[in-house]
């Protein structure tokens, strides 16, 4: 195989990996790009791409004094979020995808997508993006190569992964890698003018678990196009994890340091809109306690001799912007202060800064909104899209834990599950053991609110382990992997806790202040692990007593805290039928241990409700 066989290659290929070169050559024949470029991951390359995208109208350079080396992108209004209805797990057998995923036969899907891929990069450059999941120092790293026609994706991948020549060197002449194909689906004919945000109305985001391939078409946005993120780090990695005996989870990783300098590490899984990023970057309100962030979104967990260790496979934060401010998440705001940030679909101020709903201070008198239109506080529409994003490197965070670059990871002391429940679920509860905790995670749910247009208010939206859109195989087998890990780890496994920051009183007010004060709950979790405090026995487990929480300096009335810690049996009884139906929906591969734990929960509810 010679590099001459890769039509349009700019310069010599910086690799001797024949498998990689053959794959690229085949892709070139399918996509028909004008040029092929191996990216090196350098700052000079990033700057050059940014300049080109500013000229093309895709990026707007922000005020250099306020946001150094930072840019704003505005996507097409049809391309603003993950599209779960167009996301497929194409396992050989439909039952292996399970009831929570869209399925299509793999060869039929490849045939269909190949029709769309044919010639889809005409007039564009195909970028070869080698990347490493997790620290590049890992002696046995998980690697990938994404072929893409989107410079925005290349720029995002440089922030979100360890990308470029170092990753290519890790792949070497004979190394294996996950193959990721991506095209925005907007070919350019000779002389045709490009648009600022190329995409296609037809979209596919497809994972092939047996062959560890990812094919994406039609979208340039976020997790649809930055294939190292949800597609690899969760959907494909969860399949690898089951096969190899580890776990790929939708979890933050937090380092908590007590006044004596002892560090603890917590992993936590929350569905969307439940405060995950804010907890990952928490600023404790308890004197003497500090926190550092290892990761805000994804954890890969592996057993070692003395316990369960977590690594963050990502290199950056891809956070939701609206609602982020110096009160709710000062660390996120400070992380963006030095610049080097890629913003998408936020508003633009008249002096070249960015703005979104929920930012500190009053809204400016005039903005350009995320669609490029004039906006004033009297406008009916939001200035920033609700799913607008900031993309920034972790090592720029003032609270970045140095261990985020340690390939061996950090030993996890506790795992938290939490949804958004106005009632039923107490503020914090320790589960009885790993199997009980697995059942609690399997039934994780958030109550629907009036804000959910299609939902019946009060019904539960189930999201097992906050992994519902990201389990790359049968959900019952995914739960079996949890049980298997617990059996292997035994008493070395971390304790599992259930938390709920969102309990409301009868008048609708929140009973718990949340945000930085959630450190008080984390302190109780640590105290519980260390055996320093007792607990009340409730239907769901060992629930905290109000007097055991450190409430010094908290304005919240003690009566509210006590109410937030209740687990009313009649409310739990109301959930039983819904939860039973959901376990049935998950199918016959749900482990017997989960069913027996649910039976035990029902028995406790009946006894308390009698």
From Swiss-Prot:
Pfam families: PEPCK_GTP, PEPCK_N
BP-aspect Gene Ontology terms: cellular response to glucose stimulus; gluconeogenesis; glycerol biosynthetic process from pyruvate; oxaloacetate metabolic process; propionate catabolic process; response to lipid; response to starvation
Annotated S-S bridges: none
Listed cofactors: Mn(2+)
Cofactor comment: Binds 1 Mn(2+) ion per subunit.
GO cellular component, one term: cytosol
Active site per the UniProt annotation: 274
GO MF annotation list: GTP binding; manganese ion binding; phosphoenolpyruvate carboxykinase (GTP) activity
Catalyzed reactions: oxaloacetate + GTP = phosphoenolpyruvate + GDP + CO2
Main location: cytoplasm
Positions bound to Mn(2+): 230, 250, 297
EC numbers on record: 4.1.1.32
Keywords: Cytoplasm, Decarboxylase, Gluconeogenesis, GTP-binding, Lyase, Manganese, Metal-binding, Nucleotide-binding
Residues that hold GTP according to the record: 273-278, 389, 420, 515-518
Binding site for substrate: 82, 221-223, 272, 387-389
Compartment(s) of residence: Cytoplasm
Associated pathway: Carbohydrate biosynthesis; gluconeogenesis
Main function: Involved in the gluconeogenesis. Catalyzes the conversion of oxaloacetate (OAA) to phosphoenolpyruvate (PEP), the rate-limiting step in the metabolic pathway that produces glucose from lactate and other precursors derived from the citric acid cycle.
PANTHER family listed in its UniProt record: PHOSPHOENOLPYRUVATE CARBOXYKINASE (PTHR11561), PHOSPHOENOLPYRUVATE CARBOXYKINASE [GTP]-RELATED (PTHR11561:SF0)
Subunit field text: Monomer.
UniProt protein name: Phosphoenolpyruvate carboxykinase [GTP]
